[in-house]
Amino acid sequence: MTNYSLRARMMILILAPTVLIGLLLSIFFVVHRYNDLQRQLEDAGASIIEPLAVSTEYGMSLQNRESIGQLISVLHRRHSDIVRAISVYDENNRLFVTSNFHLDPSSMQLGSNVPFPRQLTVTRDGDIMILRTPIISESYSPDESPSSDAKNSQNMLGYIALELDLKSVRLQQYKEIFISSVMMLFCIGIALIFGWRLMRDVTGPIRNMVNTVDRIRRGQLDSRVEGFMLGELDMLKNGINSMAMSLAAYHEEMQHNIDQATSDLRETLEQMEIQNVELDLAKKRAQEAARIKSEFLANMSHELRTPLNGVIGFTRLTLKTELTPTQRDHLNTIERSANNLLAIINDVLDFSKLEAGKLILESIPFPLRSTLDEVVTLLAHSSHDKGLELTLNIKSDVPDNVIGDPLRLQQIITNLVGNAIKFTENGNIDILVEKRALSNTKVQIEVQIRDTGIGIPERDQSRLFQAFRQADASISRRHGGTGLGLVITQKLVNEMGGDISFHSQPNRGSTFWFHINLDLNPNIIIEGPSTQCLAGKRLAYVEPNSAAAQCTLDILSETPLEVVYSPTFSALPPAHYDMMLLGIAVTFREPLTMQHERLAKAVSMTDFLMLALPCHAQVNAEKLKQDGIGACLLKPLTPTRLLPALTEFCHHKQNTLLPVTDESKLAMTVMAVDDNPANLKLIGALLEDMVQHVELCDSGHQAVERAKQMPFDLILMDIQMPDMDGIRACELIHQLPHQQQTPVIAVTAHAMAGQKEKLLGAGMSDYLAKPIEEERLHNLLLRYKPGSGISSRVVTPEVNEIVVNPNATLDWQLALRQAAGKTDLARDMLQMLLDFLPEVRNKVEEQLVGENPEGLVDLIHKLHGSCGYSGVPRMKNLCQLIEQQLRSGTKEEDLEPELLELLDEMDNVAREASKILG
């Protein structure tokens, strides 16, 4: 909408009505006058033609043209100002006489088919008006009915046509229009004068007031509106002047307050400067105190761990001696208290590192599912001891090969699940892992830990992530702890680029969840066992706990199995199944041997019975296997444990391997290099059955010398060897002219993601993980045999993963499997392990007494390799843990409990081996 000024609006409001009314009146006057003039002209013509018609009756009767001509000429001259011509027509519509022969008389004549007028008629054509009237004989009576043809009537003598000129009327009309326009312009001028005067009386004062208000806006508060004004303008003037006076008074008061506040602020700033100096000094003192405190906590925590590890270790050793029940109870109490104290010290040490910003996260490739499976397995013992069902559900779309810090991720899970176990008396603890976001290089995962514990009151939830604070002071008295676990967890999650939160309701449980960002490792090193052999098989699944059942059903849905689920064994449809998975409730405390009838019935219903056992029931695993149970799995069931057990069923169905393409030994010359005699003997025994020529070397130097002497079709190279490692030996061998194309296969026990790429980049052709399985070795030989081509496809038997009980001291079936089913070889491998144990024991004992012997990590590595072929999974895992800790920089004195446990396990292995070796 257009914004007009007040002057323009006033002019429009004044002139518009005046112009509109004047224009309407002028139009009305001109139109009325125009019609009036035409009517006057028509009346004048009628006053001429009607008497003339009466006067010409006699002349027409006598056909006297002269008399009629004189008569119309006189009338024409008398009225020449308006008359252009007068014409008389006879009864035959022929011109009888006219007063103006210069005009065309035909324009005044009636048409041939037009009847004679019976009375006066008027027609107009432009500036011409024609009047016609009949000449009637005196014998004619108007009362007579007219004949159908006026021309043939005896009383109609003709008619007179009078042509009038309208130009004179037009001139008069123009004069009237001019007069009206002049009068309207005069009125508009008068209105303009009055409007201008009104605008001057209104806009002038308003402009004065606007200027005054503008001066007030610019700060000239002494400005006032001057001059005489009328009515409302005077009221407005007084209002503006009053407002200016109020503003001036307010401004004066405000200025006074500002001056006073400025003075006070200046004094305050001076005081704040003094306080800032004092605060800066206090801050420096506090930072120095915090630094000293952090160093003190870190140093004291480290110093306390060393003697505490000795207390724990010697307590465990004492527990293995003959003790009275009271002494054993006291020692158990000492061990539990020492373990709790060690956990507290570890928390304080981690907290100190986080506070000091000295905790550095690793960025290494690792398998996510195996990492989570490992930590959940460790936590399952304490969960099952309390009768709590622990479940782990990793969604299938979560990537497994990631890069990050697996130990810190396990620490986060341990803290959260440990709290859930601590504050839950019955029910479930469920762990859910989902993918939240995925890109080409990163994945964000969400981990939820849900429990059915006591919950956290809303008033205490704000204190949950504060250091050395717990939701309730009585918690530390009932359950122990320092209040650092969640603080450390939060800081670790933040360091991983994530966040943590929770939701809790008293007496209904809590749900903690966190998000972390992990890099994706595009190189898949270890793949899960193939489940194609399960196609068409039926599996019966019995599990009373719905959450545990759902997790397992999610795993089974990724296989081609047909699954029949029942919450109870009695409700299971009676039929014969290929496999049966029977879940034992964690609250079940009776010996499983007492369930003989139930287990016997289950065995009769299936070809392969598997039991999902809580930790406290694992003591019956070996006895159950002897009674016909196919596999005993530890709860919670995860893909890393369940899928190999399922594919073990396929392995049992295969009595022998599928035949290879050549029934005889492969025409190959293979060299195996390993510094461990047990490993070298096993590899040699396996190769003797597969290839024609085998060369064995126990060092990298010997392998290089042997490679100089003869060509090889394939070389199996151990990586970690003294003096010269496998990578350096591979480089030297490939420098030989006749060995440049010889494939070298890396053989190592470190089956970690990223290891294969490192080895391939160093010149290795392929990768073979320890312990070496006969099937995998045979497949490798077929792939690299001369003439086959590395890219050629070889029909090989399906390789199934070995189902291993990680807590077994000696698994003879596993030892036989690792020795390719050769009993003598398995016994030799076990005996070589026993012969090697005294050397390891001496080194470990030297370390425990503080002598710090050299080569401990290499010796543990060698023992780790020997355990991989001797069927001792517990000692193998323990060696792997100690080796990883030592290689990651952990000091030997910090591993005292693990070393003592290793000594105990050596005794256990020797005791179990004596039963087999005799």
From Swiss-Prot:
From the record, give the transmembrane residue ranges.
10-31, 177-196
Location of Phosphohistidine modifications: H302, H861
Per the annotation, which location comes first and is thus the protein's main one? membrane
- Cytoplasmic side of the membrane: what ranges? 1-9, 197-918
Topology relative to the lipid bilayer, per the entry, is: Multi-pass membrane protein
Question: What organism is listed for this UniProt entry?
Answer: Escherichia coli (strain K12)
- Specify the HPt domain's residue ranges: 822-918
In terms of NCBIfam families, this protein maps to: PRK11107.1 (NF008318)
Keyword set, alphabetical order: ATP-binding, Cell inner membrane, Cell membrane, Kinase, Membrane, Nucleotide-binding, Phosphoprotein, Transcription, Transcription regulation, Transferase, Transmembrane, Transmembrane helix, Two-component regulatory system
| Highest rank taxon of the organism | Bacteria
* Protein name listed in UniProt: Signal transduction histidine-protein kinase BarA
Which function does this protein serve?
A: Member of the two-component regulatory system UvrY/BarA involved in the regulation of carbon metabolism via the CsrA/CsrB regulatory system. Phosphorylates UvrY, probably via a four-step phosphorelay.
Reactions the enzyme catalyzes: ATP + protein L-histidine = ADP + protein N-phospho-L-histidine
Keyword check for ATP-binding, yes or no: yes
